[in-house]
Amino acid sequence: MNKDKKCSFLKGFTLVEMLVAVSIFVILVFSVLAVLIAGQRVWNDGETQMDIQFEARRIMQRMSEELTYANPDNITISDTQDAITFVVPSSYNYTTGNIEWGNQIQYFLGGVNGHTLLRREGANTVVIGRNVSSVRFTLNGDRVGIQLVLSKQSPSRNNLQVELNSQVSLRN
């Protein structure tokens, strides 16, 4: 065999072919990475949205259950409509047929930044919920309207918000 003849089967990649292949690979990797990052952001936003929806429902249920037992004559709503004060029955006297009323209960916004919903009964104040942007109470006859807005920033820096509205029928 003649050593001067080059074997046709020993051909390799040229530099240009290698650069094109690497460029296509890099574009593909960055495309997949962009899709994964977008998916993670959507996941984080969805998870944060579910968290504040759950929190809003929990807060609304707690207030609604307690307000159900209030008497419309014993309800006071602040001028700014962001606080409500009421009393609920503590017991019923079967002998006299009278309802014995308990301590005053108040729901209001407070905390360090004003985004914490608090419940005060007597000298005890407890946190009902956090991330509360606004709460609004209205009284119409024997119904209390509650508008509750919660907001929270997701890990991907999106501000998410949930608004719940409820009408509570008063029993007493």
Q: What would you call each of these model-derived segments?
A:
Residues 13-68:
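Aliphatic-rich helix starts adjacent to a transmembrane/signal segment
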Residues 1-13:
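N-terminal leader/signal peptides at the extreme start of proteins
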Residues 92, 150-154, 168-172:
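Beta-strand elements of well-folded, non-transmembrane domains
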Residues 142-150:
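A short hydrophobic beta-strand element
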Residues 156-162:
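Beta-sandwich strand segments
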Residues 76-143, 161:
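Type IV pilin-like appendage domain
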